[in-house]
């Protein structure tokens, strides 16, 4: 009993009046009442049995703070996402022991059907009712569903369908077998076998290639997102996933691997449940076999509901930042609330995540990956850094792509559609275009006016050499070239130069995005230019590329066979 102050001791009338006021909801003067707390009947499943933890994926989306936010037959209970969710309540038996209430004799679920997928019959207030399941087994049995997601097991899929009031079906998990066939057909096969891709002579092994573009995804906090690294190759590539972490070693995840809310399924699909801001970042798929290795980056942005709408409204009007801002290091100092943001990393040629402390010392910080790319990568992504992309079509055309991991051009099979810029008809074309020096990554790749042979024929001089000194001037520049070999010289008499370096004038240079992109170093270059007033001159579209034994041999063959004379007689061939 509460102590009733202000009433005469021993007065039954005073106590009765105070009790009446209390029952009417009017506390007597001087009476201290405890705060009222709204609560539904029953207990949470995890209070009844630790093994009944609320663990269905769908329950994490029905977040709550108190029972008042839930249905009358539900409780607000902790879930595996670290928050609370509305779930069906449990009850104590008549002896006070925790456990489900025994069904009254007059209530039964025997002839009561629940039509919604993922629902089950339960007795509520003496009547059978349908409710969504709030308990799933812990053992993984990855299930591919018709909504395009892979669930931890069948129960998780049913719970998702019930929470949304929809129907989800189990579908065959997508898996693309290697091409060509990894083993010969057995003798007992039919006389007319099914159509298979044609065999390509000499391609006993093919390096991994992607079937689809690695797309950026942006989700709201609490949603589920998945990435499929759809690759082919011979032999079958092994796939691993890792997240690019800030100042920490990356954790490699293989198929059938669970780490927190991140799962890699048995078909190597990466699934992130209940996405949180710290889950944003670059998720890298690595596919490896005996013929080569492929790495593809899948960016993920995780934003709140308000940020998502604001980003959708502002992204079309995004403006590029000055190059100097994009090249500044991320501002990681702590000046207040910490958030996960994106910044442009010139060395990685990509946007990465970091912990932003709101110091605002520079502008190289963005809410989403897309906003970062719009601001600091307004030009096309350097094609030589793109992964080999086969595409969904079935033309099966041999092509070449530059592999930034090995630093070499490798063959792959192109399907004929939806490829990318890292796609060349021959190894020679690939080596002519890749790699190119990485400078300001907002700049497009420098492209010469003509290809190797045509540029050779139309140039006044062609030399093999190294840049020993470079001087920048407004709209121009000067380079000192140590000449290793003179392949062509029509106007300067370079054979009399001896050991002296050749001074080359660079015309119409934009030093924020220099073309040709020459740098001081020991790497041998093929330099083709013009002669103007006795001076060696390079223009933005002049041919300057990495020298190789193959290229040098080809240019010597052009001289020996007098190919340039033939091209002069037939201009249409150039």
From Swiss-Prot:
- Report which superkingdom the organism of origin falls in: Eukaryota
The glycosylation sites are 517
**Which UniProt keywords are listed?**
Disulfide bond, Glycoprotein, Immunoglobulin domain, Metalloenzyme inhibitor, Metalloprotease inhibitor, Protease inhibitor, Repeat, Secreted, Serine protease inhibitor, Signal
Report domain NTR positions: 443-564
UniProt-recorded Gene Ontology molecular function terms: receptor antagonist activity; serine-type endopeptidase inhibitor activity; transforming growth factor beta binding
Major site of localization recorded for this protein: secreted
Start and end residues of each BPTI/Kunitz inhibitor domain: 326-376, 384-434
Note the CDD domains from the entry: IgI_3_WFIKKN-like, KAZAL_FS, Kunitz_WFIKKN_1-like, Kunitz_WFIKKN_2-like, NTR_WFIKKN
Q: Which SUPFAM superfamilies does this chain map to?
A: BPTI-like (SSF57362), Elafin-like (SSF57256), Immunoglobulin (SSF48726), Kazal-type serine protease inhibitors (SSF100895), TIMP-like (SSF50242)
Kazal-like domain: residues covered: 124-175
The SS bond pairs are 44-77, 60-81, 64-76, 70-86, 132-162, 136-155, 144-173, 229-285, 326-376, 335-359, 351-372, 384-434, 393-417, 409-430, 443-513, 446-515, 457-564
Q: Mind telling me which SMART domains this protein's record contains?
A: IG, IGc2, KU, WAP
Any one Gene Ontology cellular component term annotated for this protein = extracellular space
- The UniProt record lists the Ig-like C2-type domain at 208-301
Where is the site Reactive bond? 138-139
Functional description taken from the UniProt entry: Protease-inhibitor that contains multiple distinct protease inhibitor domains. Probably has serine protease- and metalloprotease-inhibitor activity. Inhibits the biological activity of mature myostatin, but not activin.
Q: Tell me, how does this one assemble?
A: Interacts with both mature and propeptide myostatin/MSTN.
Q: What is this protein called?
A: WAP, Kazal, immunoglobulin, Kunitz and NTR domain-containing protein 2
């Amino acid at each position: 009993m509460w102590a009733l102050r202000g009433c005469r001791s021993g007065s039954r009338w005073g106590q009765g009046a105070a009790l009446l006021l209390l029952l009417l909801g009017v506390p007597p003067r001087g009476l201290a009442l405890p705060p009222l707390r709204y609560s539904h009947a029953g207990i949470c499943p995890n209070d009844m049995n630790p093994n009944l933890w609320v663990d269905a994926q769908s329950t994490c989306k029905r977040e709550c703070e108190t029972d008042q936010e839930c249905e009358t037959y539900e409780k607000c209970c902790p879930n595996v996402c670290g928050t609370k969710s509305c779930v069906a309540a449990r009850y104590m038996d008549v002896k006070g022991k925790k456990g489900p209430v025994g069904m009254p004799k007059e209530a039964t679920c025997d002839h009561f059907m629940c039509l919604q997928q993922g629902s089950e019959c339960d007795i509520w207030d003496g009547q059978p009712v349908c409710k969504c399941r709030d308990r799933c087994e812990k053992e993984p049995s990855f299930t591919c569903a018709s909504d395009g997601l892979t669930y931890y097991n069948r129960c998780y899929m049913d719970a998702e369908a019930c929470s949304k009031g929809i129907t989800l079906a189990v579908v065959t998990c997508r898996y693309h077998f290697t091409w060509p066939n990894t083993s010969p057909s057995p003798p007992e096969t039919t006389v007319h076998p099914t159509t298979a891709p044609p065999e390509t002579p000499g391609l006993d092994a093919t390096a991994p290639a992607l079937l689809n573009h690695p797309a950026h995804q942006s989700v709201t906090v609490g949603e589920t997102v998945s990435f499929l690294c759809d690759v082919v190759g011979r032999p079958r590539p092994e796939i691993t996933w890792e997240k690019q972490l800030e100042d920490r070693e990356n954790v490699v995840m293989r198929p059938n691997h669970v780490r927190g809310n991140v799962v890699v399924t048995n078909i190597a699909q990466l699934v992130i449940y209940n996405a949180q801001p710290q889950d944003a970042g670059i998720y890298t798929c690595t596919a490896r076999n005996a013929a080569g290795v492929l790495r593809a980056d899948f960016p993920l942005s995780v934003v709140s509901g308000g940020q998502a709408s604001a980003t959708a409204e502002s992204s079309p009007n995004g403006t590029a930042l000055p190059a100097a801002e994009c090249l500044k290091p991320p501002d990681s100092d702590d000046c207040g609330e910490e958030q996960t943001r994106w910044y442009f990393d010139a060395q990685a040629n990509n946007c990465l995540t970091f912990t932003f402390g709101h110091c605002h010392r520079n502008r190289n910080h963005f809410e989403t990956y897309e906003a970062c790319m719009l601001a600091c990568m307004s030009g096309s992504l350097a094609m030589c850094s793109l992964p080999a992309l086969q595409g969904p079509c079935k033309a099966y055309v041999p092509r070449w792509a530059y592999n930034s991991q090995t630093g070499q051009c490798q063959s792959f099979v192109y399907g004929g559609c939806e490829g990318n810029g890292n796609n060349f008809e021959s190894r020679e074309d690939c080596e002519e275009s890749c790699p190119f020096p990485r400078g300001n990554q907002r700049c497009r790749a420098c492209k010469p006016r003509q290809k190797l042979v045509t540029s050779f024929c139309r140039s006044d001089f062609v030399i093999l050499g190294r840049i020993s000194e470079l001087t920048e001037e407004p709209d121009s520049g000067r380079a000192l070239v140590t000449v290793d070999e003179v392949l062509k010289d029509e106007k300067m008499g370079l054979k009399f130069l001896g050991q002296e370096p050749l001074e080359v004038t660079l015309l119409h240079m934009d030093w924020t995005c220099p073309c040709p992109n020459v740098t001081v170093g020991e790497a041998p270059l093929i330099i083709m230019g013009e002669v103007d007033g006795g001076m060696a001159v390079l223009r933005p579209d002049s041919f300057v590329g990495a020298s190789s034994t193959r290229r040098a041999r080809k240019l010597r063959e052009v001289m020996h066979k007098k190919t340039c004379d033939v091209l002069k007689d037939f201009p249409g061939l150039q």
